[in-house]
Amino acid sequence: MNARLTGLGLNLLSFAVGIGGWYLLTATGAVVLPGPVDVLERAVTLLLNGQLVGDIFASLRRVLSGFVLGVALAIPVGFLMGWYRIARSPIEPWVQFFRMIPPLAVIPLAIVTLGIDESPKIFVIFLASFLSSVVATYQGVISVDRTLINAARVLGAKDATIFARVIVPASVPFILVGVRIGLGSAWATVVAAELIAAQSGLGYRMQQAQLYYDLPTIFVSLVTIGILGLFMDRLLQAADRRLTQWQERA
């Protein structure tokens, strides 16, 4: 408990120092950017007129849709690649091929083929989340200590039992790392997608604000994305601690 309180205190201190440094830089004119007070005032205005809430829900809907679909497909595909060599050979090269292509580069193609509605945005988010999570899951399966597998076989365990009792638990830390990376990729991708083709969302709001050099609104969107991403990442960290209680931690 004391360690958690200390960590929380250091987190809050870090944020306070960061905001204080931001305030000093803008107040002294060292950088020509809006200060924390200006950004807070604009955030209140956007909250009261409903724009910020609408943009948050629009971006969250896209992120969660693509992210959940990507992870839901990545985990079984990753296990399939890692557990069955006959499946690994035809699938793994394609995964690595598409992993080398930035999801943002797919946005124009997705818009041309899927239209300008929600489909292309969700697709590129799905792709970014899938590629991050599938590689982590695959790596987790092939990294399982062979001694554990051989010991289970000596004790008479069948393949299904080994998979459920050895492979899956040992792979969970890798999977959760991939999921967290996929979450970051999902947020980066949704902002880029909204910058190009959207009528709502935090990325769309930044693009509109850029046209009028509205820096406070741009900062509101940036800070909101950071807060939402941090909150979702903390939820995944909590799930990680609960699912991997057996694992020794530094």
UniProtKB/Swiss-Prot annotation:
Keyword vocabulary terms for this entry: Cell inner membrane, Cell membrane, Membrane, Transmembrane, Transmembrane helix, Transport
Gene Ontology biological process terms in this record: transmembrane transport
Name of a matching Pfam family: BPD_transp_1
Chain segments annotated as transmembrane: 12-32, 63-83, 94-114, 122-142, 172-192, 211-231
Subcellular location: Cell inner membrane
Domain called ABC transmembrane type-1: residue spans: 56-236
Major localization class: membrane
Membrane topology: Multi-pass membrane protein
Assigned GO CC terms: plasma membrane
InterPro entries in the record: MetI-like, MetI-like_sf
Job of this protein: Probably part of an ABC transporter complex. Probably responsible for the translocation of the substrate across the membrane.
Quaternary structure note: The complex is composed of two ATP-binding proteins (BRA1187), two transmembrane proteins (BRA1188) and a solute-binding protein (BRA1186).
Family: Belongs to the binding-protein-dependent transport system permease family.
Record protein name field: Probable ABC transporter permease protein BRA1188/BS1330_II1179
Organism: Brucella suis biovar 1 (strain 1330)
